[in-house]
């Protein structure tokens, strides 16, 4: 109730001070002093909501006072937002890099890169028992699941995008795009539940029908689930890429007697190919960073295998596993999560950089 009373009073006082300044040509610093005094009186009012509103009003009134310098204020605000984002990213990168150095001081880089097991053999380094931290099984598992997911999502996404952009009516396009937006908002844990309860059982029944042996937690289940999950994402990207092709090129080629299918194959796809490739690379980055579906559908067993019917694990799953529970921050297991984060960061950064390079070539 006090907040409801104080806020309108503050607004009235601010307006009166503003009019008083304009009429009597009072210096701006006197006006600002009054605004600051009112604001910080409300800060000590011991009400977070009133404090937030009063500070927001302060910045609004500052912008109103310096309306002749509004462009400079907006430019400065945008620069501050950019600087905050940059330094947050830089801080994350530095923290990961520093903790990774601490890990490699305890575990040799050669073991990390070339050991074929993860967490199986127990060795002793500096009188401390730790596991064998070889990233090879994690890289193979990540690569295997990514390949399966992209084999599913690229053909379905490309054909769906072509139909939506070239053949579907406006009503159908609106319904499909709305549905894709809804599907994109579904949490990944729902797709993980779908993979465990339905997809895993279905694939196991199909494999048994053909006489194949398959684990209940397999890379095939995880790859298919992630492919289904990112399908709305890649369809939207590919549709935008196809619709960006100028209509003059299409109509000019069709005026020469080409069919719509020939126009798509010879004009639309080649012209939009750089954007299509960048969309695929961005989708790969999202597949590599997925954690929940893989954790629910595959598990944490780090097996070095290229068989999609066997159980594998990924880099993100091991990061989540190593940081789960009560862990010593300086333990080798915790530091291993930072080393894996560094590898994951480098991989995704290279993919995104290559995607931007492909788009610039367009």
Per-range role (PLM):
Residues 44-59, 133-163, 350:
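Transmembrane alpha-helix signature in integral membrane proteins
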Residues 237, 242, 260-298:
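Transmembrane alpha-helices
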């Amino acid at each position: 109730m006090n907040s409801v009373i104080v806020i309108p009073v503050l607004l009235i006082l601010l307006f009166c001070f503003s009019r008083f300044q304009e009429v009597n040509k009072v210096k701006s610093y006197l006006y600002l002093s009054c605004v600051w005094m009112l604001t910080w009186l409300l800060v000590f009012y011991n009400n977070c909501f009133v404090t937030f509103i009063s500070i927001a009003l302060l910045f609004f009134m500052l912008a109103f006072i310096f309306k002749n310098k509004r462009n400079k204020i907006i430019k400065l605000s945008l620069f501050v937002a950019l600087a905050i984002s940059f330094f947050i990213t830089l801080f994350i990168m530095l923290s990961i890099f520093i903790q990774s150095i601490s890990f490699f001081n305890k575990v040799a880089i050669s073991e990390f890169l070339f050991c074929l097991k993860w967490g199986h053999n127990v060795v002793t380094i500096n009188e401390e028992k730790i596991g064998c931290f070889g990233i090879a099984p994690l890289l193979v598992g990540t690569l295997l699941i990514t390949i399966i997911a992209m084999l599913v999502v690229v053909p379905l996404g490309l054909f769906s995008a072509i139909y939506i952009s070239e053949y579907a009516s406006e009503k159908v396009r609106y319904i499909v795009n709305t549905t894709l937006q809804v599907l994109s908002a579904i949490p990944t844990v729902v797709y993980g539940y779908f993979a465990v309860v339905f997809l895993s059982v279905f694939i196991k029944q199909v494999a048994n029908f053909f006489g194949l042996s398959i684990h209940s937690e397999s890379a095939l289940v995880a790859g298919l689930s992630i492919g289904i999950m990112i399908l709305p994402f890649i369809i939207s990207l590919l549709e935008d890429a196809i619709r960006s092709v100028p209509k003059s090129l299409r109509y000019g080629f069709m005026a020469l007697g080409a069919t719509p299918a020939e126009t798509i194959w010879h004009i639309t796809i080649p012209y939009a190919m750089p954007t299509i490739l960048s969309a695929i690379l961005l989708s790969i980055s999202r597949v590599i960073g997925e954690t929940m579906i893989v954790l629910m559908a595959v598990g944490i067993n780090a097996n070095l295998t290229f068989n999609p019917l066997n159980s594998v694990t990924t880099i993100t799953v091991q990061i989540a596993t190593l940081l789960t529970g009560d862990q010593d921050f300086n333990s080798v297991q915790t530091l291993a999560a930072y080393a894996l984060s560094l590898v994951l960061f480098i991989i995704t950064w290279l993919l995104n950089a290559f995607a931007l390079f492909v788009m610039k070539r367009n």
